[in-house]
């Protein structure tokens, strides 16, 4: 289109099952004053983008780097520093979504006590999603934090150069590349199976590359 949408916030107002959203290459600096699409946990989590729309089986909603243009889209979160809140860049509650080919950089931490931020937070009810060739790097946040949902496929994604210099004296103890934390309390009613990390790489993260400490089952 000669009049593309400027933000994912606007995109989320209009997408429906079967739509393909092409993201042009370039760096998208999220402004400090952008209102979060939602907050969770009594306001503790500042969720920049809420991926709450769902596709259907065989008709996913796709968010893809534009294959007709050279270069990667980069979402730069370095200006987003909400006081006393944890930052989640992509809060995923929808199902049958396909995200591919972009970067998330510069995600911040503002709380000086025990805390964490996340680039992707996937929760119960988010099922049958595919995350491919996504890079989360050069920030203070966990790359992927999987808390719930079933049959989510995280494929060939990278998390690197992430270190939290702000909380707990800058020890960086909560910044994992990938976290799979589906436990018995978050599963409920037999949900929470079939999630796969495949071909993912993690390096130079200040805590674990892959953390399954709270996962009820891993194979």
Identify the residue ranges that each predicted region occupies.
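Short, well-ordered beta-to-alpha junction loops that form the rim of enzyme active sites
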Residues: 25-27, 33, 146-149, 212-214
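Loop/turn elements at helix/coil->beta-strand transitions in domains of secreted/extracellular proteins
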Residues: 16-20, 59-60
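Beta-sheet entry/capping signal
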Residues: 20, 142-143, 151
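Extracellular beta-strand/beta-solenoid scaffold signature
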Residues: 37-51, 79-90, 112-123, 138-146, ...
């Amino acid at each position: 289109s000669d009049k593309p949408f400027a933000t994912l916030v606007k995109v989320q107002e209009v997408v429906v099952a079967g739509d393909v959203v092409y993201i042009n290459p370039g760096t998208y600096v999220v402004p400090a004053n952008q209102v979060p699409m939602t907050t969770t946990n009594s306001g503790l989590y500042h969720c920049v983008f809420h991926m709450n729309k769902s596709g259907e089986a065989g008709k996913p909603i796709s968010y893809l780097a534009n294959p007709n243009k050279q270069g990667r889209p980069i979402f730069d979160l370095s200006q987003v520093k909400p006081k006393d809140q944890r930052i989640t860049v992509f809060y995923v509650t929808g199902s049958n979504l396909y995200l591919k080919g972009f970067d998330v950089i510069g995600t911040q931490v503002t709380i000086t006590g025990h805390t964490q931020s996340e680039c992707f937070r996937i929760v119960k009810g988010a099922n049958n999603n595919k995350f491919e060739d996504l890079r989360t790097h050069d920030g203070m946040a966990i790359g992927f934090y999987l808390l719930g949902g079933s049959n989510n496929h995280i494929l060939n994604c990278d998390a690197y150069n992430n270190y939290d210099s702000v909380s707990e004296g800058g020890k960086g103890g909560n910044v994992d590349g990938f976290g799979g934390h589906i436990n018995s309390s978050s599963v409920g009613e037999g949900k929470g199976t079939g999630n796969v990390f495949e071909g993912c790489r993690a390096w130079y993260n200040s805590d674990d590359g892959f953390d399954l400490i709270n996962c009820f089952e891993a194979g």
